[in-house]
Design a protein with these regions (language model features):
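N-terminal Sec/SRP start-transfer signal
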Residues: 1-32
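Residue-level recognition of transmembrane alpha-helices
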Residues: 25-27, 40, 186
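Mid-to-C-terminal secondary-structure elements
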Residues: 128, 132-152, 156-242
Length: 242
């Protein structure tokens, strides 16, 4: 219930100490202002990270090996080792809640680049060995043709999917890309698809258009990798936190 006497008392108290009233009001205003700024910055950071991830599934992680931190059975500390094909199968078999486990390899290691030849033109690009489900983990737009499929995996087909940046640098304007051949470290690959990355990571966005994807099994065979796995892209089921 409205009480005139109470409001008069409040107004008199505020008028009696105008400086304290001003400082208190400023403190309340400043606190609200900072809260709004922090909430806005938090949302902006979240949106920025999502854009920079370039469509990468939010329930996907990457796993790779590092040097050992302890000696083991007479072997020294600091040893380097690799995942192998059986490790991939073990994860699929023994770990519940995984939707995709995609082994990956890259020529030259992390951020490695290798000469790719098309006729008289040469370029340095990242070349990846992948499984078909990788396009579900890091989506990309297929502009022409197709992505890698399990027929390619089973038959070790020498096929590749290339980015728009590769076409701009190695092909003449208007030249037919699908069905052409491109040479990677001396091995000929048939171009079966053209992709466009949806990455928004600044300068990396341009580099993400300059990649080649080939079947994982073909990669291991063509480049003498044996059963080595560089790293894995692992996607959990929707109801499983990672």
């Amino acid at each position: 219930m409205f009480s005139r006497d109470k409001w008069n008392e409040i107004i008199e108290a505020l008028s009696a100490n105008p400086f304290r009233t001003l400082i208190t009001a400023f403190g309340v205003f400043w606190g609200i202002f900072i809260l709004v700024i922090l909430l806005s910055a938090s949302q902006g950071l979240q949106n920025g990270i999502k854009r920079q991830m370039g469509g990468l599934s939010t329930n996907t992680m990457f796993m790779w090996t590092q040097a050992t931190s302890k000696p083991y059975k007479g072997l020294p500390q600091g040893r380097n080792f690799n995942f192998k094909n059986p490790d991939v199968e073990a994860l699929k078999r023994d770990v519940d809640g995984l939707l995709y486990v995609s082994p990956r390899n890259q020529l030259g290691g992390f951020r490695g680049s290798n000469n790719v030849v098309r006729g008289t033109k040469t370029g340095a690009y990242n070349v990846y060995g992948d499984y078909p489900e990788f396009i579900l983990q890091q989506p990309m737009n297929i502009l022409k043709g197709r992505f890698i499929n399990y027929g390619d995996i089973a038959n070790n087909r020498k096929v590749t999917v290339i980015g728009e940046g590769v076409i701009r640098e190695l092909y003449a304007p208007g030249e037919e890309v699908l069905g052409s051949y491109i040479k990677v470290q001396g091995v000929n690959f048939l171009v079966v698809g053209v992709y466009k990355s949806i990455s928004n990571m600044g300068g990396d966005a341009e580099e993400s258009q300059k990649q080649l994807f080939i079947p994982f099994t073909t990669f291991q065979q063509a480049f003498n990798y044996g059963d080595i796995v560089g790293w894995m892209a692992i996607t959990a089921q929707d109801d499983v936190p990672i």
